[in-house]
Amino acid sequence: MSKRDFYEVLGVGRDASEREVKKAYKRLAMKFHPDRNPGDKEAEASFKEVKEAYEILTDSDKKAAYDQFGHAGVDPNRGGGGHGGADFGDVFGDVFGDIFGGGRRGGGQRQAARGSDLRYNLELSLEEAVKGLSKELRIPTLVACEPCDGSGAKKGSKPTTCGTCHGQGQVQMRQGFFAVQQACPTCHGRGKIIKDPCNKCHGEGRVEKSKTLSVKIPAGVDTGDRIRLSGEGEAGEFGAPPGDLYVQVSVREHAIFQRDGNNLYCEVPISFSKAALGGEIEVPTLDGKVNLKIPTETQTGRMFRMRGKGVKSVRSHAVGDLLCKVVMETPVNLNERQKELLREFEETLTGQSKKHSPKAEGFFDGVKKFFQDLNS
């Protein structure tokens, strides 16, 4: 049986934040957890499905692979690996522990959370995308508090062991015949208490701040490309590792060129006389103007390829081409002398359309035959 889409499993959109994914996971994991549905095989299968979706969509690398390749990109049988099925004990700790501020790993203490990943949408001109550049980005984020060095405790003091749970992060509560472990209500699962909190971060260990980063954009990027800056996301809780920053690239439409992969396309207007007699015209490229030789009797719509005048691939040394489509432009605002010359020219073609305009002659012959067949 084919797997369901992970976003569908959790009931979130593809643009859902990590927080939204986690919220959906908690709700569904609690609903389908085997301890709440003893003997229910369907609930157990749904629980495993929710667990797997959550593990993929909260891991930035696995999520990127899934978004690009679907289930094939995260299939453990395609690379040797995998979690080997859902661990009910771990998930019980993840879900119910997080609700109270802690889990059961690490001897019962809630592990300080890694910083959240950030996304920055960067819009570039075609010239910037093709040639590459360095960009200064101003990112609003959470950074480690400097006065307390991220500990949350005022300088000169430090967190103390919680007296309620004795540093375990959990306490045992009795409900009828059952003893239930839950996060310590005093320290919220950390196992430590900040008695003298830092004045700047108020015991949080992190503060809001905008930071400026210089990001090198490689030549050849295109809309949809993503640049990962490891460790430049939000600071983690109480010294935990920071998240990553993902720069999402989009390229504005250009007035002259259209891009398709590494090739560029443009339309170049030419005069009637230039198309008939041939000659040279100037063609724009991203490196400046170049001359293009137009053969005699060139028809409108003809495509000319200028090799190596396209875009350098961001993933190799290959360079695309510039494809120029010539479009014959009908002259306008003619004076009487110019019109008279065209009439004289037209008269010289009378009776010679097959010689000078073979396509038109063939077209009208076809129209004539069509009506003859229609009336026969």
Curated annotation (Swiss-Prot):
The note describing how and how many cofactors are bound reads: Binds 2 Zn(2+) ions per monomer.
Q: Kindly state which keywords UniProt assigns to this record, in alphabetical order.
A: Chaperone, Cytoplasm, DNA replication, Metal-binding, Repeat, Stress response, Zinc, Zinc-finger
NCBIfam families, per database record? DnaJ_bact, PRK10767.1
CXXCXGXG motif repeats mapped onto the chain: 145-152, 162-169, 184-191, 198-205
Cofactor(s) it depends on:
Zn(2+)
Return the SMART domains for the record. Answer: DnaJ
Assembly, in brief, is: Homodimer.
What GO CC terms are in its UniProt record? cytoplasm
Task: Provide the domain comment.
Answer: The J domain is necessary and sufficient to stimulate DnaK ATPase activity. Zinc center 1 plays an important role in the autonomous, DnaK-independent chaperone activity of DnaJ. Zinc center 2 is essential for interaction with DnaK and for DnaJ activity.
Q: Where does Zn(2+) 1 bind?
A: 145, 148, 198, 201
UniProt source species? Shewanella piezotolerans (strain WP3 / JCM 13877)
Places the protein is found:
Cytoplasm
The similarity annotation says:
Belongs to the DnaJ family.
Q: What is its main location?
A: cytoplasm
Name the positions where Zn(2+) 2 binds.
Answer: 162, 165, 184, 187
Q: Which residues form the J domain?
A: 5-70
- Gene field: dnaJ
Quote the protein name from its UniProt record.
Answer: Chaperone protein DnaJ
Recall the taxonomic lineage recorded for the source organism.
Bacteria, Pseudomonadati, Pseudomonadota, Gammaproteobacteria, Alteromonadales
SUPFAM superfamilies for the chain: Chaperone J-domain, DnaJ/Hsp40 cysteine-rich domain, HSP40/DnaJ peptide-binding domain
The record's section on InterPro entries has:
DnaJ (IPR012724), DnaJ_C (IPR002939), DnaJ_domain (IPR001623), DnaJ_domain_CS (IPR018253), HSP40/DnaJ_pept-bd (IPR008971), HSP_DnaJ_Cys-rich_dom (IPR001305), HSP_DnaJ_Cys-rich_dom_sf (IPR036410), J_dom_sf (IPR036869)
Q: Where are the zinc fingers (CR-type)?
A: 132-210
